[in-house]
Amino acid sequence: MRLVLCEKPSQGRDIAKFLGATQRGDGFLSGPGVTVTWARGHLLETAEPEVYGEQYGKPWRTEVLPLLPQQWKLVVKADAKAQFAVINRLLKQVDEVVIATDADREGEVIARELLDYCKFQGRIFRLWMSALDDASIRAALSDLWPSSRTEALYYAGVGRSRADWLIGMNLTRLFTLKGREVGIGNVLSVGRVQTPTLAIVVQRDSEIENFVAKPYFEVIATLAVNGAAFPAKWVPAAQYCDEEKRCIQPGVVAQVVQLCRQTPTGAVIDCQTERKKQSAPLAFSLSSLQQACSRHWGMPAQTVLDIAQKLYETHKLTSYPRTDCGYLPVSMREEIPQVLSAVVGTDPALQPVVAQLDTQFVSRIWNDKKITAHHGIIPTKHTGDLSKLSDEERNVYQLVRLHYLAQFMPLMEVDATEATFNIGGQLFRTRGNVVVKAGWKSLFGKMADDDEKGDEAVLPAMQAGQVCQVQGAEQKVLQTKPPAPYNDGTLIAAMTNAAAFVTDAALKKVLKENAGIGTEATRAGIIDTLVKRGFLVREKKALRSTPLGRSLVDVLPGTLTNPGLTALWEQMLDEVAAGRVSLDDFMAKQSQWVSQLVAQGKSQPLAIQAPPSPPCPVCGGKTSQRKGKKGSFWRCLNYPDCKGIVGDGGNAKTLQGRGGSSLPTRLKIKLR
């Protein structure tokens, strides 16, 4: 008897259909020789600290840290007990299990932690697929993998979970307790990924706040060759420039302008035209999709992930979204006709576009050597109904579809010309791009990347030694600009490119080869967590750090805020997933690191400024702002020993004193 274990009910129903498992049960579907059941994400979670000893329960205490479990314990989530009972019972009735959860590290953990917890001893196989359309399910069911092929992926997932738990439980408690000592009532959460991400935003905000605009200068001459006028920019000598090669000496600029106005002609020093061919953009990875959606529509990263997941799971119009790869395996070229047929079936208006595609053209996207666990996000062979998509879902689907269709269009060809000129002994340069063949770019229209900026001036034919007329010159006074604040897309890009934040060459090399901070599946959630914790705030499309977030980064040790070190842990998890590092070795290093951080944190005072707060009306101590069912209030930091509270805004409130006595009073406290 075989049991197919899926990650979610919709996935289970899709697979059950192919297996003839049509008989409905409570939390499962069954058929001849097979039963299909499902989790609902993680049904198990790491036990709370008090399970490892009552000394780790509430109230939190600094002296018992660090908490380093020797025997890790899982418990069934409170809201998952019913479905867990179903799976546990079914596992006792079968001798073979097919893991059919999502094809990634987290999907592996969801299934295998259940099998381990329930002590399943039978045979295990893996169903591995990147899409939930009919053809993909059929192909995967006919090619089940042995369990051993993905077992190391499970250990990597467990290592990630335990590492996050160790850092979160130990360091959040430590710094929250240290914060209370100086009047900070908030939970100062610390995370292996969230803290370096917060530090990235804090650093950018600091650069913006401390930025001082400086003037710089340009000279733009208007030249003409054979009657055709065009602009050319002065190239100042190095001694007149800052480190960015911007001229910062206005007196020199004025002299050059005057020189140009007194010089009627110049000479062409050199003129080169190069025909450049540009390939279509690759299929999307999750992070590149999040960046594009942020750029075009200002979508938060978590929203993009949710939409991509729904397009994959519910509508079945696109492939698996949590991928870090933009390439496709060569074998998938066989599916091109079916995919294009489904695209037209879903949106008949695309028939004229699809008719002009060259499906024999082999773009750079087809590359087996670049494939990771999953290929890029593309349309599936499933014909859907556009009318059932929300506006945001339709936008994301069309963007994914556009990148796939572009693979069958010609390369974009541009004639890029660069010419230099001598005007009175001064060097001037101009550049121009002329699109010779739009190729794939013709599909994009307004969806062309906003970042693509270039000089589109049409330059006349010219050659070295040719005379040019100087028709005029003007000085431009410009100001340096501060860096832009992060938004969801640019922060996702920064998390992916952690190498930009380190200077050590060896570490930079490692980070470039790795996926940066976090994973494709977790980055959006990290940003959302930082917002919910009050460390980041959304200002229109921008993400800005709050005073609390900046203060926290300022007082934490650099080992916690350094993106490079965090990315190294992800690199080691990749080694675990590849079977080159054991889970025990990974956890031993992680435990040693956490122990060092706890010891360091205990020995140093927390130099953080608490926000202004009213005094406790009972004991006179400090209070912290809390949120209750009826709004905010201020509670004594000596709680539960002292139960004094003050209503937010100083309104009349009942104050709970020591021993629970009621002390009606009116307080008018102004916070400055």
Task: Report residues per predicted region.
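OB-fold/S1-family RNA-binding modules
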Residues: 49, 93-98, 138, 231-248, ...
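Phosphate-interacting basic helix/loop segments used at nucleotide- and nucleic-acid interfaces
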Residues: 72-97, 200-201, 292-293, 398-405, ...
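C-terminal or mid-to-C-terminal helical accessory/interaction module adjacent to the motor/catalytic core
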Residues: 136-221, 274
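Metal- or metallocofactor-binding catalytic centers and their adjacent structured scaffolds
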Residues: 241-282, 564
